[in-house]
Amino acid sequence: MRTGDTRTSGLSTRPVHRLLQAHHSRMADVHMRELFDTDPQRFERFSLQVGDLLLDYSKNRITDETMDLLVRMAEESDVAGWRERMFRGDKINTTENRAVLHVALRNRSNRPVNVDGEDVMPKVNAVIERMGAFAEQVRGGVWRGYSGALITDVVNIGIGGSDLGPQMVVQALKPYRHPRLKLHFISNVDGAHVKETLEALDPETTLFIVSSKTFTTQETMTNAHYARDWFLARAGDVAHVARHFVAVSTNRDAVTAFGIDAANMFEFWDWVGGRYSLWSAIGLSIVLAVGAERFLELLEGAHEMDEHFRHAPLRQNMPVILALLGIWYNNFFGAESHAILPYDHYLRSLPAYLEQADMESNGKSVDRDGRVVDYPTGQIIWGATGINGQHAFYQLLHQGTKMIPADFIVSITPHTELQEHHDILIANFLAQTEALMRGRTREETLEEMGRSPGDPSVQHRVFEGNHPSNAILLKKLTPHTLGMLIALYEHKIFVEGVIWNLNSYDQWGVELGKQLAGRILPELHADAPVAGHDASTNALINHYRRMTQPHPGL
């Protein structure tokens, strides 16, 4: 644990913490096989349905007492109070003095939401209408390129929240996409990304969305300037830029200097965090892909989960339950990571999206009061599509030495007519959660294999089981259920942050590396040997220079 002032008002100081520690000691050796064998109603008591989402959390190392104590932890952490502060627009992002109002972006009730005394809903609704109108022009063939050709390809240039969220949603909703429009996403400042993407496109039929709040983000603007140069190499006239580039930004001067018409700048606000911004104008690529009506369905799904989260009792609250289970394993069992395992090809980018949403939010070691915490906080989030994962890393989940709780996610109704494929997928989804929970004892292994007790190979085929998992079943992957699913995880992250006494909505951890990169960049091509860093960094910079632009004496 880090040194420093560890006096904290967080998790470890709450009265229920000791009760949970004692309860964990009693639960440490309890196997879930016993819990299921002695309680035929376990699924009914530890499952919850909200709209078209079903959460089965019965395959967790919990009892009613566990959940009662964890809910008490949420109460002592004032989760309900912090939840209300967020929804009403209080500035709960204390380090940046900002409200946290991604929920306002999908507030389909249109109830007033005030920031600094102003209802933000009229501006939110106006931007949504502008996005829809623009998208319908492009989709309907009214908006065309400089040569009069239809737009066939849309390239979103952004990074972080301006990339991961929209890309994940566009990919997830591919069955709803416009048949003419292909969506592309460029984020990496590695030149291979932008070069390979643009090589396959035609400047006359390509529309670019440049997503940067300040219009100064280095990676995004480097790619945007390259894209503009690529475009002008064919189009010639800089005036044509306005037909092929739009912006999601708040910096009107920089946008117009780039050549984009200010009328084609879509704004968002400082109370929208990057990793929670897909609901805002950052989601313009989503609207272009699936249309305004489907985008509204996405917002409505998120709003349904928002309403559930805001009003349901903590014990019957889906995001709260997921968060409490995360706290249980992270802070009492010592689990350091959590796997996201979607059994749906269209959700294959969900793990990467949640990596940012969760780890950038709760990857903090200093609490709201500026004190270094004395307890573990954010989990390592990782994962992959389920079937592929089974043939890659599930070995460690089943027979490894680490506890790795997992979320299994599946759609009951597929988008394809390949029912046999889907039946196999569902069977594997169900089998994995059962195998992780129940395992296979030595006696069961001997019986199944027909081997003698002295056979040394038997132990290698024993499965301890008792590995926790949640199962999340969507009736079908639609814009509505996807909105619900994303909001479910957003609120889970919020609740965990409250219990850990963290500000989940800043990200100072990304700043230091960017500052140092700004210092190193000119040194890569300087004349004199570099000596202003540590020995390792100096040597690496000088090695790079020798390999790329040899300088005598380096």
Swiss-Prot record:
Single GO MF descriptor: monosaccharide binding
Top enzyme class: isomerase
Associated pathway: Carbohydrate biosynthesis; gluconeogenesis; Carbohydrate degradation; glycolysis; D-glyceraldehyde 3-phosphate and glycerone phosphate from D-glucose: step 2/4
Catalysed reaction equations from the record: alpha-D-glucose 6-phosphate = beta-D-fructose 6-phosphate
GO biological process: gluconeogenesis; glucose 6-phosphate metabolic process; glycolytic process
Domain of life the protein comes from: Bacteria
Record EC number: 5.3.1.9
Predominant location: cytoplasm
Presence of keyword Translocase: no
Keywords from the UniProt entry: Cytoplasm, Gluconeogenesis, Glycolysis, Isomerase
Family under the similarity heading: Belongs to the GPI family.
Identification of the protein by name: Glucose-6-phosphate isomerase 2
Organism annotation: Thiobacillus denitrificans (strain ATCC 25259 / T1)
